[in-house]
């Protein structure tokens, strides 16, 4: 048996974790999103924020690879936070997660620099949206006339 010395000496490519900031004022929702995201081998919730101001501060201090952002928070709404983050760090994809998904909100999200939006209750959409955004895509589900 022969061993290829060059093959043995080659460094293995490391799988770098994708660092995700989860922003939601509800601790139960943050826990749910963390559990959902960390089922993926290379996705890691690197930080959490409870308010819009806290999210902006955390992104500025230690920019993540992606932001999952709640729309409705006590201080700033998700659109205001998204505008600020995308203005400072346009390369960071932002996914708006909300219980109030509508055609109007998705249009406003696009204008605010958000690259995707989905309902918090749709587990499959959240995973699909994160994956799409991490591969430089956008994710805005089609809205039926009843949802507009």
Residue ranges of each PLM-predicted region?
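Conserved acidic segment of CheY-like receiver
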Residues: 16-29, 33-37
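Active-site residues of response regulator receiver
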Residues: 24, 70, 98
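Acidic catalytic/metal-coordinating carboxylates
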Residues: 51-54, 77-80
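Active-site beta3 strand of CheY-like receiver
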Residues: 62-68
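The feature encodes the CheY-like receiver
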Residues: 74
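Alpha4 helix (beta4-alpha4-beta5 surface) of REC/receiver domains from two-component response regulators
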Residues: 80, 101-118, 124-128
């Amino acid at each position: 048996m022969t061993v290829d010395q060059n093959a043995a000496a080659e460094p293995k490519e490391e799988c770098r974790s994708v660092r995700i900031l989860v922003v939601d004022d509800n601790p139960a929702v943050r826990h749910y999103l963390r559990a959902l995201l960390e089922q993926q081998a290379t996705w890691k919730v690197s930080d959490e924020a409870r308010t819009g101001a806290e999210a902006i501060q955390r992104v500025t201090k230690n920019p993540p690879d992606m932001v999952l952002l709640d729309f409705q928070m006590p201080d700033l709404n998700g659109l205001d936070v998204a505008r600020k983050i995308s203005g400072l760090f346009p390369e960071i994809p932002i996914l708006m997660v909300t219980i109030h998904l509508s055609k109007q909100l998705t249009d406003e999200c696009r204008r605010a620099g958000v690259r995707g939006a989905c309902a918090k209750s749709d587990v499959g959409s959240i995973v699909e949206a994160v994956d799409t955004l991490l591969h430089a895509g956008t994710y805005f589900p089609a809205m039926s006339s009843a949802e507009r």
